[in-house]
Amino acid sequence: MAKRSIWAGDEDNKPKKRETYADDTVGRFHSGYSETNERGKVVPVALDKWRISTGEQSVADAVAQLFGGTPVENEESTSENFIDVFTDRPKVPVIIEADGIHWDMKLWLNGKLKHHCDGFDFVSHADEEMIGQPCGCPKLFDERKAAAKEYDAPNPAITVTFTLADDPELGRFKFQTGSWTLFKVLHEAEDDVERVGKGGAVLANLELELVEYTPKRGPMRNKLVSYYKPTITVLKSYNDAIAD
């Protein structure tokens, strides 16, 4: 007879199994984190410096030495990357391969993927015959964004895969975001990677850049508004960087 788990009858409090990823990355870059507010609601919090998460202590120690911060294990995390390093760096030099920037568009509702396209055609669908067919999303950028805000259209799902220019041998990292601000100019970064890299890798800066402005209309009229946006700035081909 199999021995019962100590959590039998207490499943709600049973520690969750950590999620594992089917890729070979060693960590993730994040522009924010989640915390529980006074009302007990989990809310997102934006950062002005990068947070790096990993599941390997050696990687956490290495990025802390490179970019500042102290590795802290997040006991509540169910992710494979359960060690956080809140760095001192808003800008990190990275190496991006020719295929290192990927995006598509996804609409999630109640944890389920309801719409998956490339902005024009379905990328996946419950009906396989619909894959490759027009998805029906708005064509104009502002209309796409407005519809997504109302959960009537998908948001961008951007993934940037890279290694650290300061320690390429440490392994590959990912930055995943749904930022419309980055999405608006992502084609420029893609073009720069292709033009500068000429089929190879490029040296670039991954940065959280401060944006400040004063709206002339709306509830924040005549008040200073500030936020940090993720940016990708291609500097030179990696071959040229090595030669310097």
UniProtKB/Swiss-Prot annotation:
Pfam families, from UniProt? Gp3-like
Summary of subunit composition and partner proteins: Interacts with the integrase.
The record lists the organism as Streptomyces phage phiC31 (Bacteriophage phi-C31)
Q: Does the keyword Ribonucleoprotein apply?
A: no
Q: What is this protein called?
A: Recombination directionality factor
User: Domain of life here?
Assistant: Viruses
Gene this chain is encoded by: 3
Induction trigger? Expressed early in the viral replication cycle.
Q: Which residues form a coiled coil?
A: none
Q: Which UniProt keywords apply?
A: Viral genome excision
Instruction: Extract the ranges annotated as region (Disordered).
Output: 1-34
